[in-house]
A protein has these predicted regions:
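A conserved mid-protein helix/loop that constitutes part of the nucleotide-sugar donor-binding site
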Residues: 19, 204-230, 237, 244-250, ...
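Nucleotide-activated donor-binding/catalytic signature segment of Leloir-type glycosyltransferases, i.e.
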Residues: 247-268
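Short alpha-helical donor nucleotide-sugar binding micro-motif in glycosyltransferases
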Residues: 267, 276-281
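Aromatic "clamp/platform" in nucleotide-sugar-dependent glycosyltransferases that forms part
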Residues: 289
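Conserved acidic donor-binding segment of nucleotide-sugar-dependent glycosyltransferases
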Residues: 320-321, 325-332, 341-347
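Short hydrophobic beta-strand element within catalytic cores of glycosyltransferases
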Residues: 306-309
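A short helix/loop element that forms part of the nucleotide-sugar donor recognition site in Leloir-type
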Residues: 186-199
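Donor nucleotide-sugar binding/catalytic pocket of nucleotide-sugar-dependent glycosyltransferases
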Residues: 39, 52-53, 136-189
Length: 392
C-alpha cells in the first residue's frame, strides 16, 4: 500500500493534527504501508524520510501556521506520479485540500479526507469582526462542499460523524480515531519534572496539555482553579502549550491573582518532556467545547493520570464511565468542586488512575492503524465497505 498524505500542518507545528499524522505514519509503516507526506516548510528542517516540504508563508492571523504554495505542490506532480501511489489522504481543508483533490484527479487516484477540526466552533474566534452566526454558516457550507468533493471522510468521533450528516454530506463516513502509541504507556520521571520547574514534590498539580487557543476554553479552567484554591491554597495548574490566546490567558491569570497557582511552560518534547509532565500531574483537566476527538485525554489516561473534563463533541466518545474520568456539568462551581474532591481523596484518585490506564489500552494506535489500512485497501479496490459508524 502506497499512500500520499497532504497537510497544511505538521511538526514542528504542534497540534492534534500533527500528532495524528505522525502516529498513523509510524503505525502504517510497521504494517508494511509506505506513506509520503506533503507538508509546509517551516524552515530549519534536517533530512526527513518520505516528507516533501513545500515553500510556505506565515499566516497573518496565526503566525504559528504556514500557507503552502499551491503552485509548488503541483510542480511535484511528475515526481509523485513516478512513485505510483494508491490513493491520496488529505488531512486539512486549506491549500492541502485543493491541491490534494487536484493531484488525485491528475493521477487518477481515489481521495479521502480526515475531518480533524470542528470549524463551526473555530472560525469565529479568529475572525471576530464578523458575526458568529455568519461564520458558523460559512463553515458548514465550506465543509459540505469539500467533503462532498472526495470519495470518503474519516471522522475521529461519533459526534463529528453526526454533525457532518446534519450538514448534508453524502459521502461515506468512516469512524477511525487516532490511537495511543505504546510509548505513551511508559512511566515518565515525576520528580525530575517537578524539580526542573521548581514545583514542590507535595504540591497538588493539575495539568492542561494542548494549544493555547480561544476555542480550548482555558479561561474556564482558570476560573475553576480560582474557586478550588480557596479550599486548597497551594493548588497549581500547569499549562503545557502555546498559541494565539496565550496573552489573553496570562492577563486573566493576573486579573484573578493566580500568579502562584498557574504556570505556563510552553510546548514540550513528546518523546521525553511531555511524558514526564503527565507523570508529574495529579489531575488532568480539560474543558474544550470543539474537540473532534480529544487525544490528550487518552494520553493523560495512558500515563495513569485521572481526568476531570466536561463532555462536548468528540470527547464524549472517550469520557465513558469505564474511563474513570469525572465528568461534571459545564459549570465552573461544579468543576471546582470535582477538583477539590479528587485532590482530597487520595485513595479514590489512585483507583481512578489505574482505571484510566487500563481503559486507554483499548485505544491502541496499532488497532486504529489496522482500521485505516483496511479502509485504504477498500478505497484502492473501489469499495466503500467499512463505512459503518462503529469504533470497536
Amino acid at each position: 500500500m502506497n499512500v500520499l498524505m497532504i497537510s497544511d500542518v505538521y511538526f514542528p507545528r504542534v497540534n492534534g493534527v500533527s500528532t495524528s499524522i505522525e502516529t498513523f505514519r509510524k503505525e502504517l509503516s510497521r504494517r508494511g504501508a509506505s506513506v509520503t507526506l506533503v507538508a509546509p516548510d517551516y524552515g530549519g528542517h534536517g533530512e526527513e524520510e518520505d516528507i516533501i516540504r513545500i515553500p510556505s508563508k506565515k499566516v497573518m492571523f496565526d503566525p504559528e501556521d504556514r500557507m503552502m504554495s499551491y503552485g509548488a505542490i503541483l510542480e511535484q506532480k511528475e515526481e509523485l506520479r513516478n512513485r505510483q501511489f494508491d490513493l491520496v489522504h488529505i488531512q486539512t481543508p486549506f491549500v492541502a485540500h485543493y491541491a490534494g483533490v487536484a493531484l488525485a484527479k491528475e493521477l487518477g487516484l481515489p481521495k479521502i479526507v480526515t475531518y480533524h477540526t470542528f470549524f463551526e466552533e473555530y472560525l469565529y474566534h479568529y475572525i471576530p469582526f464578523l458575526p458568529a452566526s455568519w461564520m458558523r454558516a460559512l463553515a458548514r457550507r465550506f465543509s459540505r462542499t469539500q467533503c462532498n468533493d472526495v470519495d470518503g471522510i474519516v471522522v475521529p468521533s461519533h459526534a463529528m460523524a453526526k454533525t457532518l450528516e446534519q450538514y448534508g454530506i453524502q459521502k461515506p463516513l468512516h469512524l477511525i480515531p487516532t490511537g495511543i502509541p505504546e510509548a505513551m504507556f511508559e512511566s515518565g520521571e515525576r520528580m525530575a519534572f517537578r524539580d526542573k520547574y521548581g514545583i514542590a514534590h507535595d504540591t497538588p498539580m493539575m495539568l492542561f496539555v494542548g494549544r493555547v487557543a480561544f476555542e480550548k476554553n482555558i479561561e474556564f479552567l482558570l476560573h475553576a482553579t480560582d474557586l478550588a484554591r480557596r479550599q486548597i491554597p497551594e493548588l497549581l495548574l500547569v499549562i503545557a502549550g502555546e498559541g494565539p490566546a496565550l496573552r489573553s490567558i496570562e492577563k486573566l491569570a493576573c486579573t484573578l491573582r493566580l500568579e502562584k497557582n498557574v504556570r505556563m511552560i510552553g510546548y514540550l518534547d513528546r518523546e521525553k518532556g511531555l511524558k514526564d509532565c503527565y507523570s508529574a500531574a495529579d489531575l488532568f483537566v480539560f474543558a474544550s467545547r470543539t474537540e473532534t476527538q480529544g487525544l490528550v485525554l487518552l494520553e493523560a489516561m495512558a500515563a495513569g493520570v485521572p481526568v476531570i473534563s466536561t463532555a462536548h463533541m468528540g470527547t464524549k466518545d472517550i469520557l465513558k464511565e469505564e474511563s474513570g474520568a469525572v465528568v461534571p456539568q459545564d459549570d465552573i462551581g461544579e468543576f471546582a468542586a470535582a477538583i477539590v474532591h479528587m485532590i482530597s481523596e487520595v485513595e479514590k484518585r489512585s483507583e481512578r488512575a489505574l482505571q484510566a490506564h487500563r481503559y486507554a489500552r483499548s485505544w491502541s494506535s496499532g488497532a486504529m492503524a489496522d482500521k485505516m489500512r483496511n479502509l485504504y485497501k477498500n478505497m484502492k479496490e473501489g469499495s466503500s465497505t467499512g463505512a459503518s459508524i462503529t469504533v470497536r
